[in-house]
Amino acid sequence: MSETPKDQGPSSPSPSPSPSAASPMPLADNEVAGSGASSPNLPLTMSASVVLADLPRDATAALEAAGSFKTDKIVVRFKPVGSAPLLAQDVCKISATRRFEEVVRYLRKKLRCKETDSVFLYVNSAFAPSLDEVVGNLHQCFKNSHGQLVVAYSLTPAFG
């Protein structure tokens, strides 16, 4: 029995990987979906297949991971702006699934604000998020290099 070296492969002049039977063949730009072989995967045009190469093909798989956060608790660091009083403890932890209104409520309680007093909160000293924004989403998008969500607060409007 003669053995061929493992690095030479088949005797064809240009070895190229053969397409897998499990991976769908993208459609050409002028082809219509559903006109070819029946495949359980969604057919894509050639231009779309390049863009969507790394995205999940099944929407349910994407939706399963969409609502989850990497950490259960988010570290929020409060920074006073202008004449706002300093907090004795400027760091707190809040559940990632809570809404930003909980952060506002916590800060108002710590500052001992009256019902009529205004408090303005800004993420990264840049924008005021909506009260129904999820804290975990803000953390994923705007955390600092220490993994903290920095919230600046003021008793008068600032940054805008």
UniProtKB/Swiss-Prot annotation:
GO terms for cellular component: Atg12-Atg5-Atg16 complex; autophagosome membrane; phagophore assembly site membrane. The keyword Protein transport applies. One of its GO terms (biological process) is glycophagy. CDD domains: Ubl_ATG12. It is a peripheral membrane protein. There is a cross-link at G160 (Glycyl lysine isopeptide (Gly-Lys) (interchain with K-102 in ATG5)). Its main location: membrane. It is found in: Preautophagosomal structure membrane. It comes from the Eukaryota. One of its GO terms (molecular function) is Atg8-family ligase activity. The keyword Protein transport applies. Disruption phenotype: Does not significantly decrease the growth rate under nutrient-rich conditions. Causes only mild infection in point-inoculated spikelets of flowering wheat heads and impairs the spreading to nearby spikelets. Reduces strongly the production of deoxynivalenol (DON), an important virulence determinant. Residues 1-40 are annotated as: Disordered. Keywords: Autophagy, Isopeptide bond, Membrane, Protein transport, Transport, Ubl conjugation pathway. Ubiquitin-like protein involved in cytoplasm to vacuole transport (Cvt), autophagy vesicles formation, mitophagy, and nucleophagy. Conjugation with ATG5 through a ubiquitin-like conjugating system involving also ATG7 as an E1-like activating enzyme and ATG10 as an E2-like conjugating enzyme, is essential for its function. The ATG12-ATG5 conjugate acts as an E3-like enzyme which is required for lipidation of ATG8 and ATG8 association to the vesicle membranes. ATG12-ATG5 rearranges the ATG3 catalytic center and enhances its E2 activity. Forms a conjugate with ATG5. Forms a thioester bond with the 'Cys-196' of ATG10. Interacts with the ATG7 C-terminal 40 amino acids domain. The ATG12-ATG5 conjugate forms a complex with several units of ATG16. The ATG12-ATG5 conjugate also associates with ATG3. Belongs to the ATG12 family. This is Ubiquitin-like protein ATG12. It comes from Gibberella zeae (strain ATCC MYA-4620 / CBS 123657 / FGSC 9075 / NRRL 31084 / PH-1).
